[in-house]
């Protein structure tokens, strides 16, 4: 287990700020873009997009408080776990088995060129250092900034790192929109609305947006070498698009990190850099919404990444990305992963293959076995 780094002194914090500023001003290359230097000097985002198209294969990681329950990442909503009860899972969050260096080495051994990890999932728990909420890994028994550790490990080994961020769902934040606003998964269906939920009218949502933008500033300045931001869930956006200032959000990201790529599944407004559907998904996702149809038409010829998971969809066990103990003994084997890779290569898209770490953050033994023996042809 890695020990928590000592609290930064004011002088060291100032030095870190200078490094961040220097990164932006000098246009320092992230390690994973070293082979794209010439293009980067002319257009950082174009260089990053070319790298992404060449990368072909990445690792997806769903890890958070929900991992402790072993029932998938939507367990709070599906089991309508009370807010206070779910929040107490933080008291047992140690991440004692989370080893960023091991994860990066495993990804490299499997032939993966990048990692995408849940910095904040729908439950609102953050795996990074943030001043915006105490509902985070640094303020848990783990006392660790897991995103910082993984960013450092990826930079050291030349892998790209995308940060998954749940923009269109947050079951913890008081000002996210309510069930009455039009989406059945906006909040768990509690019989009595929690007092912590404050949203009453569309104007209230701006308080949540300000929170998101503040956290994006943290992510893009604390980890300036990340490859981009991977937003989710798109249906939460399609159901209520008018409350999301999506252009403002994208402008913020591109101002703070000129090379950063942006994805939001099939697309929110068509200004995304690549499409990122699930399991070969297409425009059928959200096709009942006109905004979805417009975004799809604008994005359909852009690079595409399809995510799939090492945990198969088993009858009665759910369709999960976070750890589900019901899937033990059924994770994908080498031949099954090769089929997914072959399909991706044949159809010209990237494969983002998910693992759901165990409650302590360690990689599932079945996934270690498969990825360690996966030989790309």
Regions from the language model: what does each represent?
Residues 1-31:
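Bacterial Sec-dependent N-terminal signal peptides
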């Amino acid at each position: 287990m890695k020990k928590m780094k000592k609290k930064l002194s004011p002088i060291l914090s100032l030095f870190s700020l200078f490094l961040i500023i220097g990164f932006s001003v000098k246009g320092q290359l992230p390690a994973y873009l070293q082979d794209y230097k010439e293009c980067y000097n002319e257009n950082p985002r174009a260089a990053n997009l070319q790298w992404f198209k060449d990368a072909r294969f990445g690792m997806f990681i769903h890890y958070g408080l929900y991992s402790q329950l072993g029932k998938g990442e939507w367990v709070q909503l599906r089991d309508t776990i009370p807010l206070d009860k779910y929040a107490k899972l933080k008291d047992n969050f140690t991440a004692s088995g989370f080893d960023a260096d091991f994860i990066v080495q495993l990804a490299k051994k499997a032939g993966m060129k990048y990692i995408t990890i849940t910095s904040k999932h729908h439950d609102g728990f953050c795996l990074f250092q943030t001043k915006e909420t105490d509902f985070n890994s640094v303020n848990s028994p783990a006392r660790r900034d897991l995103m910082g550790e993984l960013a450092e490990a990826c930079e050291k080994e030349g892998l790209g790192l995308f940060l998954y961020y749940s923009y269109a769902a947050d079951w913890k934040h008081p000002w996210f929109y309510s069930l009455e606003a039009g989406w059945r998964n906006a909040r768990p269906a509690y019989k009595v609305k929690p007092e912590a939920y404050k949203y009453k009218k569309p104007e209230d949502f701006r308080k949540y947006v300000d929170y998101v933008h503040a956290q994006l500033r943290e992510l893009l300045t604390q980890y300036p070498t990340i490859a981009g931001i991977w937003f989710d869930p798109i249906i939460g956006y399609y159901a209520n698009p008018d409350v999301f200032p999506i252009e403002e959000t994208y402008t913020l990201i591109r101002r703070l990190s000129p090379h950063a790529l942006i994805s939001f599944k099939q697309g929110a407004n068509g200004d995304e850099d690549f499409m990122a559907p699930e399991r070969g998904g297409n425009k059928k996702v959200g096709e009942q919404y006109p905004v979805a149809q417009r975004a799809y038409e604008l994005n359909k010829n852009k690079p595409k990444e399809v995510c799939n998971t090492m945990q198969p969809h088993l009858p009665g066990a759910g369709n999960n990305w976070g750890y589900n103990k019901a899937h033990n003994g059924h994770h994908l084997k080498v031949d099954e992963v090769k089929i997914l890779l072959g399909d991706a290569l044949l159809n010209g898209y990237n494969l983002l293959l998910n693992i759901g770490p165990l409650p302590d953050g360690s990689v599932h033994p079945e996934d270690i076995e498969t990825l360690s023996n996966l030989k790309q042809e």
